[in-house]
């Protein structure tokens, strides 16, 4: 994918996008990939090298990554931050990176997923957010 800078944002932002360290590890698919449209995923795979995206389209994701890095400061025996979990289902390896797991007791875990977004995003239901948390819960239960 080619990254553009149509609005002349600082070059450091472009490098942050280009040097993204995200990986789904050895998984066939990530939780976010699994809950996304299969048609969009297929088209993205097919046309990835000819796709174009602007730096400005990635700013929310950068802010989310920054929040995740800061959240790691809160890690303790009770709080597990930024852990990537893996599970197998029907021969597929699935992975998900959980922002925060709060260990309530030996058998109970609260899962939190931070969202850095605009107010418009919370004005309607986001079933994909619920689906994401349900997949994370499945990964936690199957460890």
Question: Residue locations for each model-derived region?
Answer:
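Metal-dependent nuclease catalytic cores that hydrolyze phosphodiester bonds in DNA/RNA
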Residues: 1-111, 118-131
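Hydrophobic/aromatic-lined pockets within catalytic cores
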Residues: 116-119, 138-142
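An active-site-proximal "capping" alpha-helix that borders the catalytic cofactor pocket
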Residues: 129-141
């Amino acid at each position: 994918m080619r990254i553009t800078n149509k609005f002349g944002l600082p070059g450091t932002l472009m490098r942050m996008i280009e040097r993204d360290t995200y990986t789904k590890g050895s998984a066939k698919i990530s939780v976010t990939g699994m809950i996304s449209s299969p048609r969009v995923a297929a088209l993205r795979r097919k046309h990835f090298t000819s796709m174009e995206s602007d730096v400005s389209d990635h700013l929310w994701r950068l802010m989310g990554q920054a929040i995740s890095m800061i959240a790691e400061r809160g890690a303790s025996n009770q709080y597990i931050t930024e852990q990537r979990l893996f599970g197998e289902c029907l021969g597929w390896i699935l992975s998900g990176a959980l922002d925060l797991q709060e260990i309530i007791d030996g058998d109970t875990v609260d899962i939190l997923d931070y969202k850095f977004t605009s107010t418009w995003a919370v004005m309607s239901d986001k079933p994909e957010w619920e689906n994401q948390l349900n997949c994370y819960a499945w990964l936690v239960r199957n460890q």
